[in-house]
Regions:
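C-terminal motif of bacterial Sec signal peptides marking the signal peptidase cleavage site
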Residues: 32-35
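Hydrophobic helical h-region of N-terminal Sec-dependent signal peptides
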Residues: 25-30
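Cross-family detector of peptidyl-prolyl cis-trans isomerase
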Residues: 37-199
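Bacterial N-terminal signal peptides that target proteins for export
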Residues: 10-24
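Polybasic, lysine-rich low-complexity intrinsically disordered segments
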Residues: 2-3, 13
């Protein structure tokens, strides 16, 4: 069995019981490849030390934040752009909305960076709440690896620890359903960006 881990970005739109919250986050994504040779013997690759993987991941996250900036539209959709000589911008690492939270996992303290672009006006979800969310996941090369353009329900206790820790930092918003079209619109929701190392 071979395990390859990489960090990714997730764009989230969070709606809790008709109230919404958007987040953009970096989510670990693990590819697991299992193969058996023709002689039916198996080989396994020993898992790497947790601290070594974390140190590599956090260095990659911090490098990304030092070399990219964000553009945010009126709906809190975020675009990441690499800083170059012809494309200047304020690095994410210098963004005034940048915060971090430290959690311990596997005996290693993990730094979870997040940008709080809008706090929201409603209630904060807890780690045990069910949330209604859409998202868009990016690899560190900015290619999209997963997306749910329409919101889906999931339990925060069933997702990665990073989501459980950062979702409660934001609040839900307000919603309005047009009785003629039955279309629900959301406003004043929490919105942000989250960066989560593997593990």
């Amino acid at each position: 069995m071979k395990i390859v881990s990489c960090e990714h970005f997730f764009k989230l739109k969070y709606y809790k019981m008709k109230l919404s919250l958007r987040l953009l986050l970096l989510l670990p994504f693990i590819f697991v490849m299992v193969g058996c040779p023709n002689d039916d013997t198996t080989t396994t690759t020993e898992a790497r030390p947790y601290l070594d993987v974390y140190n590599e991941d956090i260095a990659e996250i911090e490098d990304f934040m030092d070399t990219h900036f964000i553009t945010v539209d009126g709906d809190y959709n975020v675009t990441f752009t690499e800083i170059t000589g012809t494309t200047p911008g304020t690095p994410i690492s210098d963004h005034p909305a940048l915060n971090f939270k430290t959690i311990s996992k596997g005996g290693v303290d993990h730094k979870l960076y997040y940008l709080k672009l809008n706090e929201g006006v409603g209630s904060n979800p807890t780690k045990l709440d069910s949330v209604f969310s859409s998202y868009k996941g990016y690899k560190t090369d900015l290619s999209v690896f997963d997306a749910a353009s329409n919101p889906i329900w999931f339990q925060l206790e069933d997702v990665i620890d990073g989501w459980q820790e950062i979702f409660p930092e934001f609040k839900s918003g307000t919603s309005f359903t047009d009785s003629d079209t039955n279309v629900t619109t959301y406003s004043d929701f929490g919105a942000g960006v989250m960066f989560v190392p593997s593990g």
